[in-house]
Curated annotation (Swiss-Prot):
SMART domains: Iso_dh. It comes from Ruegeria pomeroyi (strain ATCC 700808 / DSM 15171 / DSS-3) (Silicibacter pomeroyi). GO terms for cellular component: cytosol. Its EC number is 1.1.1.85. Pfam families: Iso_dh. This is 3-isopropylmalate dehydrogenase.
Amino acid sequence: MSNPSLLILPGDGIGPEVMAEVRKIIGWFGDKRGLNFDVSEDLVGGAAYDVHGVPLADETMAKAQEADAVLLGAVGGPKYDDLDFSVKPERGLLRLRKEMDLFSNLRPAQCFDALADFSSLKKDIVAGLDIMIVRELTSGVYFGEPRGIFEEGNERVGINTQRYTESEIERVARSAFELAMRRSKKLCSMEKANVMESGILWREVVTRVAKDYPEVELSHMYADNGAMQLVRAPKQFDVILTDNLFGDILSDCAAMLTGSLGMLPSASLGAPMANGRPKALYEPVHGSAPDIAGQGKANPIACILSFAMALRYSFDQGAEADRLEAAVEQVLADGVRTADLLGTEGVTPVSTTEMGAAILAKLDASL
């Protein structure tokens, strides 16, 4: 039986630095746990533009379509600001999402106890927080037609169209319910059914899909109230399902409850392939951070936790994902911190590679 395949796309800025630490951890799982991957590496974003003149080569896209999972570092940087929109680094990432049809975006917001003081909210509100936001990623107002800026009478008008089909809602809803079954069997769907027809349809479809998951406790909430509740009492939620626009806003809101974007992974999942695994792209939430690139200051944890998500959702290795996540939590509990997490007494400042080494040491200790 062949090893599962993993395509690595380090990208730009701090991407190569944080990905280097992930490569070491991938190697550890092969050496110590017999969990081997066929790993290949290619270019994306500005790095691809510098070589190929496009932010994602066709050959790389083909590799991504064939891989069991894709792990991406970060894309973009000021060097590419003046490029035509069609070849900006971010277009490489957008092409991956579009052509792989990655419709279900998973954004965890977990607050490690050791970092609760970094949240802008009181410690007792966020300590132990563990939310998963499932955002529909390929439809809705960002993609609906008609769209554009047009002349109408004596002035211009900007138009965007919120559009969802039943099938688009159903597939992301099923993704969220399946996820809820893995977790606490609790799901809150957020929309604006009080003022938007797309929200009415969304609620109807989600309610219908819920009948196939009787073990999951389903609730509905208007998205504006959901944003307020995320700040007021975030631990009332477990899995949150929402559309593209509201998911964009709510996931960023939830992210800041945790204290640092350098900690947050994400997954974008598509339909199952022939082998039963979903097409999948994993990436940290943070950007390319060109201001600290090459200085050893980058926090590799978000990228490492993105690999943990790949272990869980693409490779059915939930126990090994737990092992890796526990190693990260133990390192943080020991007071080991990269530059983005300094600011409290009794911590040990470390570089990117030192953080990776500390996590590897905890993995060794877990055996």
